Amino acid sequence: MSMVYLIRPLKLLVIFVATSCVSLPTMAFEPLNTDDAGTIGKNVNQIEQYFYVLHNNVAGNPGGEASPGEEFRGIGNAKAFPLTYTYGLSESTEMSLATTYYSTPRGSYAPFANNILGLKWRFMGDGGSGFGMAIKPMITLPASTSQQVQGLGLAKTNYKLHYMLSYYWDSFQVHTNISYARNPYNKNYPISGSYAPNQTNIVSGSIAPVWIVNSWLKLALDIGSSIDTLPNSGAVNDYGMVAAIFSINKNIDIGLSYLQSGTTPSNAVSGKGITSDRSEIGVTWRF
């Protein structure tokens, strides 16, 4: 893990992302939080297996506006292996199944949580040039009450609708996301020991400009914010991330990232008063 923690000192939040060759369909942007409007293509399979180390300073905080499936609402440290399988139903649609195995924390509950079903539809563009738009509804299956108590999920079905807008140039890309999440939970049980009201109606936005260095390396910035839509509620999280993904060949990418989040953008960037931080490394395989 020493290679991952080399990224921690960086305060200017610049993301290094490498994926497949530019001429190929755009693939999912793991480990970025911001997704792109591209799809993997008909009959293509994709597996994303990652490992992250996360520290939360605030109970109930969802891991710094976490990537879908990587939410951790407990306080303290977590170590987990998020896994996502994606299958291309057509050139413009894909379905995904995701789960996360937690090695830390452990207890008298199943270590698998954040079980998510997703369907992505690109309704504008070819996913590789010019404008592209896509939507992705997602359903997170209920966690057990024991998992909710530890912050490994919420003990009710959660829903999210994700909108993606991308623009692709030859050497530059911009991806923006807007989403709404409905996150009910079992109020008879705490979330990581806290009975304080959890954010249940979340609107999120993010942007990730991407600089294409060559066919195996991209550089990007990923920043975002989430706001509770309830009256008198402020920002839930602002985040910034650094990452690097190296394309071994056209079908295999190795990525690593570092994320900081805070209750204000300046906290997220400076690292002062951060609510959480996450280091992540993993591989994406298409076949």
Language model features with spans:
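Transmembrane beta-barrel domains of Gram-negative outer membranes and organellar outer membranes
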Residues: 27-287
